[in-house]
Curated annotation (Swiss-Prot):
PANTHER family: ATP SYNTHASE SUBUNIT B, ATP SYNTHASE SUBUNIT B', CHLOROPLASTIC. The keyword Nucleotidyltransferase does not apply. It holds the Pfam family ATP-synt_B. F-type ATPases have 2 components, F(1) - the catalytic core - and F(0) - the membrane proton channel. F(1) has five subunits: alpha(3), beta(3), gamma(1), delta(1), epsilon(1). F(0) has four main subunits: a(1), b(2) and c(10-14). The alpha and beta chains form an alternating ring which encloses part of the gamma chain. F(1) is attached to F(0) by a central stalk formed by the gamma and epsilon chains, while a peripheral stalk is formed by the delta and b chains. CDD domains: ATP-synt_Fo_b (cd06503). This is ATP synthase subunit b. It is found in: Cell inner membrane.
Length: 175
């Protein structure tokens, strides 16, 4: 109770006191002026420096992103060119291999035809030689037979002996 009596005597705390308001306002203004002179400049400077640092980091990040995108585009273009070049080289290699294969096949075919032709010619020549040799032997045998027949009489028994001797001569020559 004593407290409430003291409050009643001095007035209420919510009653405006012009002297208190005046000195509170002057104190507030003085504190603001002191803070402005001493602390406000460094605080604002630090905030501006921090803002500039953040903006610089953001700008560098955008620059790095754009540079990375440019490098990525360049790498994609280089990769596409390399793939196109490798496809071209593979295609040219296949075309060259097909061309070489066709040339080799054609050359082998031509060579085999030449060999077959040469073999046929050689066989034909050997056949002619064999026929010539056979004709010569037959002619020789006929001449000898005629010679023996002319020397001997045309008796049947003599003819038989001449033919037998020619057959024997022919058999001995073949062996």
């Amino acid at each position: 109770m004593l407290m409430s009596a003291v409050i009643l005597l001095s007035g209420s705390l919510l009653d405006p006191n012009p002297g208190l308001i005046f000195w509170t306002a002057i104190t507030f203004v003085l504190v603001l002026l002191i803070l402005k002179k001493i602390a406000w400049g460094p605080i604002l400077g630090a905030l501006e420096e921090r803002e500039k640092g953040i903006q610089s980091s953001i700008d560098r990040a955008y620059g790095a992103k754009e540079e990375a995108e440019a490098i990525l585009r360049q790498n994609k273009e280089t990769l596409a060119k390399a793939e196109a070049e490798s496809d071209r080289i593979i295609r040219e290699g296949r075309e060259f291999a097909d061309k070489i294969r066709a040339e080799i096949t054609e050359k082998a075919h031509t060579e085999s035809q030449k060999m077959i032709g040469a073999a046929k010619d050689e066989i034909e020549q050997e056949k002619r030689r064999a026929l010539d040799v056979l004709r010569n032997e037959v002619a020789d045998l006929a001449v000898r037979g005629a010679e023996k027949i002319i020397r001997a009489s045309l008796d049947g028994e003599v003819q038989r002996k001449v033919v037998d001797s020619m057959i024997a001569d022919l058999s001995t020559k073949q062996n």
